[in-house]
UniProtKB/Swiss-Prot annotation:
The modification Tele-methylhistidine is found at residue 154. GO terms for molecular function: protein-L-histidine N-tele-methyltransferase activity. Monomethylated at His-154 through automethylation. Automethylation at His-154 positively regulates the methyltransferase activity toward RPL3. Probably methylated on other residues. Belongs to the methyltransferase superfamily. METTL18 family. Residues 30-52, 64-94 are annotated as: Disordered. The modification Phosphoserine is found at residues 72, 77. GO terms for biological process: peptidyl-lysine monomethylation; regulation of ribosome biogenesis; regulation of rRNA processing; regulation of translation; regulation of translational elongation. Protein-L-histidine N-tele-methyltransferase that specifically monomethylates RPL3, thereby regulating translation elongation. Histidine methylation of RPL3 regulates translation elongation by slowing ribosome traversal on tyrosine codons: slower elongation provides enough time for proper folding of synthesized proteins and prevents cellular aggregation of tyrosine-rich proteins. This is Histidine protein methyltransferase 1 homolog. Residues 30-42 have a biased composition (Basic and acidic residues). Interacts with GRWD1 and members of the heat shock protein 90 and 70 families; these proteins may possibly be methylation substrates for the enzyme. Its main location: cytoplasm. The gene is METTL18.
Amino acid sequence: MTFQFNFTIEDHLEDELTSLGDGALALHSSKESLVSERQKGTHRDKKCSTEQSDLLQDHLWEHKSERNEAPSQDPDSSFGAANSSSNLEPHEEKPCLKVAKEHAVPKDLKKVLENKVTETLPGLQHVNISIMKTTLLKENFPGENIISKSFSSHSDLISGVYEGGLKIWECTFDLLAYLTKAKVKFAGKKVLDLGCGSGLLGIMALKGGAKEIHFQDYNSVVIDEVTLPNVVANSTLEDEENDVNEPDVKRLRRSTVAQELCKCRFFSGEWSEFCKLVLSSEKLFEKYDLILTSETIYNPDYYVPLHQTFLRLLDKNGQVLLASKVHYFGVGGGTHLFQKFVEERNVFETRTLEIIDEGLKRCLIEMTFKYPT
């Protein structure tokens, strides 16, 4: 399989300062020129600051309440601050986090699959994403506009805008194969498909008898146009295969499909915002027994919120199954860097389950708490 990444990398500003004195003067002048822009964006900046402050407070609370055995230092915050400051220009504001939201399952399930063409994998169906993209472009889809941006930039990833959910990446197939081969048990478990994209990992958990499955992706259009249709297509697959004509049987099957979909919830948004959303529920949040995630460690900038998500949402006896390439060229992430990051925080232990040495080298990793009690 030929696999290629296309990335959008912003040009850095050239350093036009010719001396220390001139540099200080230029910096001062630049600051003054930004005053009016900052005044115009006061409300936005305050909102960003509040969100960032809330995230830090949430982290400190989790650190104190759940990491009693781990070192008292807060490594995630220091890593995030250093990483953030090194990537921002002198006057560049840190962008606001993408607010998370829950997507309701439509009552009319036929509309979910309207204008969708499905393809078949062993035991699974999924929407043909290329046809879906073309259809939405022709219809001038009013959503996040990530499809046209992806086409125009010739990129499968646009950091902070589009995080690759409109593609089934190689490692997803690796993890699907492992789940089957290792006979991973889903029955009675609460499962999260994190960075779900097509949602095939969560769908496999649904078919395996999981009691509850949550699907999360960065982009809302991915949830609405890919994940939800895939879940519906796989829930109704049995009906289509048997071509049942008896009204009573059809009603029974529709009832079964509805019951299956009641086990599923769908979310979009940035990871730390997703954590806030599910943890702010009125009823006590039951943590996940199993988190499935594929191709989510390509960018080291995202390691802090990803680690925090595992820390906050995984049950103390839970398990993360993660699929990734060993190295992502052009972005810098990969399994070795992420495992080093995890080891330095001393919260989780990692174990390599499988190495796939075909094309770009890939790995399957298991994560569990070092201190489950």
